[in-house]
Amino acid sequence: MQYLLAQTSQNQQLGITAKMANRHGLIAGATGTGKTVTLRKMAEAFSDDGVPVFLVDVKGDLSGLVQPGAMQGKIAERIEQFNLGGESYLSGYPVSFWDVFGETGIPLRTTISEMGPLLLSRLLNLNATQEGLLNLVFRVADDKGLLLIDLKDLRAMLKYVAENAKSFQVEYGNVSAASVGAIQRALLTLENEGATNLFGEPALNLDDWLQTRDGRGVINVLNSEKLINSPRMYSAFLLWLMAELFEQLPEVGDPDKPKFVMFFDEAHLLFDGAPSVLVDKVEQVVRLIRSKGVGIYFVTQNPLDLPDTVLGQLGNRVQHALRAFTPRDQKAVKSAAETFRSNPNINVVETISILGVGQALVSFLDEKGMPTPVEIAYIFPPKSQLAPITAEQRAAWVKDDDLYAFYKDYVDNESAFEVLNQQADLAAVAQKQAEQAKQEEENGIMGSLSRMIFGTKKRGEQLTVTEELVSGVAKAVGRNIRSQITKQIMRGILGAFKK
């Protein structure tokens, strides 16, 4: 089976082979050449075959997926040109809208513990020393079973580690006060960018993205118009999502069709400024995640935006026009041309620069996993409405989504912040009790005389306020420790939880 996406001038239809869709792909081209339409058409094709999809909407123009398109203008011309079936070709799709900020979609959250120290270090833009300290903080939290759900948990954990630095030194290493301060300042910057919304509960359950409706895969659209203004937060979230899928999904080998497909727009942001250790791990995840039935499609202007180790794994390629005005542009054109299997009838280097809007150089993997010779083709028009729906329509669609009721409200569950505060309260009360005992001891005979006169408490006699506080805090801390220290937390390839 193929997901038909394009047609040549010789009426040859081209598409992605279903069993090769998890071999990943690339959609590249200059601004305004048709990348978003290609992305949309691919997402529709996967959905039609019951494959759930995740895609990023960085321009806010993909909400029209919920409505059928209209037989007018260029859409009507292309439908007739390619004999696609007229009005019956058009269709709306099952869509769930998501938004980290909770403004135009279902609130989308993860937790600090789930993101892990490696991706969080990138998010906070930490240097190697500061990253080392953050790893130490996570290790202490993991060993003690303290959950880091939101930013206040991380702040509390940093404070706890700093205040107890000497006790951790032998087992975990030195705790630099300067690094603690630097991380705290980075957290302030992150909060100013709106990251408070990203971390919390209920956190995303990936099963909610692996859904179908009436036999078609649900298209999960992440509104990123605002998120894209914080590139590190944008890239860290997408990398976390990739890692979560890799860790949570079972091995399926080579399925007849993918289990899930992701489209990462502005894909260069995943790698801009990333340390080599992170790039290496991303390359490893991309290589291994296909055995989980997941296909990843990178969308970017220039193929050179991606590391060679990642680019080499993208088997299904759609290359829209590139403009070759500068030496770097010319290098990009040549590089893009070299990634295609040659076709004696096409000069790829010359063709890339003169492709029209909606035209592309296309090469997909065949049944044996071999790239087909490059062809010049026209991308089929989307079945859904190209224009976005209104804000009112979108708001109504979001509230009608079955998942909205579960995710809409932030829940502040008990975690490291509460546990550490309770421990601090208990320590303060214990210190006060010690001081009182010392005072009684210093009182000497007067203390003994008091006990002789008034005696000790009888069974059932009411506790003092201080004794009640100590008892209550001790019980609360005990409950938290028993409930949280159930097993040592295990982390996977990008630092994400292994649940």
Language-model features: locations:
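N-terminal pre-Walker A segment at the start of P-loop NTPase domains
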Residues: 1-14
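Pre-Walker A (Motif I) flank of P-loop NTPase domains
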Residues: 12, 20-25, 51, 216-220
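Conserved lysine of the Walker
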Residues: 35
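Conserved P-loop NTPase motor module
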Residues: 10, 107-113, 124, 351-466
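P-loop NTPase motor domains
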Residues: 43-53, 60-284, 310, 353-355, ...
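Conserved ATP-driven motor cores of ASCE-family P-loop NTPases powering translocation/secretion/packaging/pilus
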Residues: 41-43, 66-87, 284-368
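Membrane-active amphipathic alpha-helices enriched in small hydrophobic residues
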Residues: 445-453, 462-493, 497
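The conserved Walker
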Residues: 27, 31, 274, 303
